[in-house]
Structure formats: C-alpha cells, structure tokens
C-alpha cells in the first residue's frame, strides 16, 4: 500500500435507499483484497451483482437492469481485468451513471489491503496475480504487479466514497462493515416449510424435524382428503397428547435458538417439518409453529410458512 493512499474503515456514510429508488454501488479493489467477498456479501443483502463486465457495456447494462428489469439495488464489480485495457474511459462512464441516477444514488466502494498482506494471501492460495497471468505489462514479480494494479485503479480509488482496508478484518467484521455502509437492516427471515419424505428432504433446510412418529390422519377415510390446515384434522390431533408435546418441544427449541442467528450474519433460516406425504402431520405442525413463532420471536425476524407438497394434495 502506498504511503499516500487513504484508508477509511470508520465514519461510514450509510446508504438507506428510499422505497422505489435505485442504488448503484460500484465495487473495485486490489486483487486479493476481498472484492469478491464484498460482492458475495452484497448479493446476500439483496443486491443484483454483475462482476467483470467490460466497461463499454457497464452503463447500458445498468440502465437495462434498473429501468426494464426493475432492479433497485445494483452492485457493479470493476477490477484490473475490466480496467486495464480501458482505464481512461472509467471517469466518463462514472459521470454518465451520476448524471443518470444522481450523485446520491451512485457510490464507489474500494477494497484494499496492505501490500505485505496481499503478498501473503497470494502465497497462501497459490494463485497468480491477474497482471502476471496475462503479462501485458511484462511484470515479473508480485510486488511489481501490485504496484501497477494500484496505479491502474487510481481513477476508481480516487473517487471512492469509502475505502475498506481488509488487512486486519475477518469475514464477519467485513460483513458488518458492508452492511453498515449500505444501510441494511438486521432482519432475517425464518421459513417454516412442510414437506413429504417420499419426495425428498429439502436440501436447503437448516433444521429438519421428522414427525412421522405421530398418528396419521391419512388412515381415517373421512380425513384422507383433508389437509393439516383443516379444522377436522386439528380436532383429530387434539385426541393425541404426543402431538401437542412434540409441537411444544420443537417450538421451545426454535424460540430459544433462532434469535442467535441474528448474531451470526444469517439472513434466511429454513425450518423443515416432514411427514410421509407432506399433507397432514407436517402441515399441521408447520402452521402451528408459524403462528407461535410469529408471536414470540423478535420483530426483526420475519416468519413465513410454505407447504412444498401442495401440488400433490388432492381434493
């Protein structure tokens, strides 16, 4: 890192886009500094991410996505691969975006790290610096590549609204820093999902509860056509204390541990409740847990319910 390079990791200016507004964030930085990690974090926060697009297409793509595609949060990754052949045109493209969206809607985030840290990271990953891989500049060693890259990225770093030095940051600290900058709230979503084991276990489930041990309304002819959402099925389950016991056991566990996800940078948690066909037992418990958790969990946690096998239900 050069002596005159300014690094800011505090006093951030949070972005809090108003409803319906467009937020364009240009993300750039030195190779090995964590730019890709930042883009992944932004994607998790709901940004539509484009990385390594040719500069000549950047402005048109932004307009296409925001005006025709309805994208409101857009992150554009620009690095040495994009910039090296056309660095002089970045300022013009940046001005075009500013004129189109307004100066308060277009920001630049520049990611960097100390040169010694970058060298250590390249050594640890055994990756080749992009400028050495193509060798357009006849660069023979990593320190020279880092210096040349820093010079090439100067049009971007010089206009940056925020520069993040990742030298001493772990991934969790980086996430919090990015979240603070973009003004993201601390909300997570809990998806309560009913499913049938006969159709497979959901691969994205964080918790899976098997309720096949409970009495099955399927074997009652008058209930077979019903679902776990029907009052007749609820009345059936009311005759079996173990149904209420299992519901309370699952609820107490989730009520205790789901809030902990707020402290671990999780934004979506899927709670899957499974029975054989995904029509009676799992649906009843999923609906019950949805109602109970909606009442008890902190308001930062949004609870939703979905029944995966609904298409298999028969009238």
From Swiss-Prot:
GO MF annotation terms: ATP binding; GTP binding
Functional note: Displays ATPase and GTPase activities.
Family according to the record: Belongs to the RapZ-like family.
SUPFAM superfamilies assigned to the protein according to its UniProt record, in alphabetical order: P-loop containing nucleoside triphosphate hydrolases
Binding site for ATP: 29-36
UniProt-listed InterPro entries: P-loop_NTPase (IPR027417), RapZ-like (IPR005337), RapZ-like_N (IPR053930), RapZ_C (IPR053931)
Identification of the protein by name: Nucleotide-binding protein PsycPRwf_2129
Pfam families reported in the protein's UniProt record: PapZ_C, RapZ-like_N
Amino-acid positions noted as binding GTP in the UniProt annotation, renumbered to this chain: 79-82
UniProt keywords, alphabetically: ATP-binding, GTP-binding, Nucleotide-binding
Species for this entry: Psychrobacter sp. (strain PRwf-1)
Taxonomic superkingdom: Bacteria
């Amino acid at each position: 890192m050069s002596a005159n390079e300014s690094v800011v990791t505090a006093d951030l200016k949070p972005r809090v886009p108003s409803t319906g507004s467009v937020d364009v964030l240009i993300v750039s930085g030195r190779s090995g500094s964590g730019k890709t990690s930042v883009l992944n974090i932004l994607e998790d926060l709901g940004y539509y991410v484009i990385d390594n697009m040719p500069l000549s297409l950047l402005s048109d793509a932004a307009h296409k996505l925001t005006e025709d595609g309805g994208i409101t949060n857009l992150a554009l990754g620009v690095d040495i691969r994009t910039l090296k052949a056309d660095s002089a045109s970045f300022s013009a493209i940046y001005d075009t975006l500013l004129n189109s969206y307004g100066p308060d809607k277009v920001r630049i985030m520049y990611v960097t790290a100390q040169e010694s840290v970058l060298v250590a990271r390249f050594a640890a990953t055994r990756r080749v610096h992009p400028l050495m891989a193509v060798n357009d500049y006849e660069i023979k060693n990593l320190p020279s590549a880092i210096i040349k890259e820093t010079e090439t990225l100067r049009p971007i770093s010089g206009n940056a609204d925020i520069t993040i030095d990742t030298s001493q940051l772990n991934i969790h600290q980086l996430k919090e820093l990015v979240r603070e900058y973009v003004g993201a709230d601390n909300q997570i979503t809990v998806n309560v999902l009913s499913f049938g084991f006969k159709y497979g276990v959901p691969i994205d489930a964080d918790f899976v509860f098997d309720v096949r041990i409970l009495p099955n309304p399927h074997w009652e002819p008058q209930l077979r056509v019903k679902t776990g959402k029907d009052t007749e099925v609820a009345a059936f389950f009311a005759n079996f204390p173990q149904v209420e016991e299992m519901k309370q056991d699952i609820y107490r566990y989730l009520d205790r541990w789901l809030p902990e996800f707020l402290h671990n940078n999780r934004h979506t948690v899927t709670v899957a409740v499974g029975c054989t066909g995904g029509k009676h037992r799992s649906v009843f418990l999923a609906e019950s847990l949805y109602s109970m958790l909606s009442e008890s969990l902190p308001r930062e946690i949004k609870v939703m319910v979905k029944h995966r096998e609904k298409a298999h239900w028969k009238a």
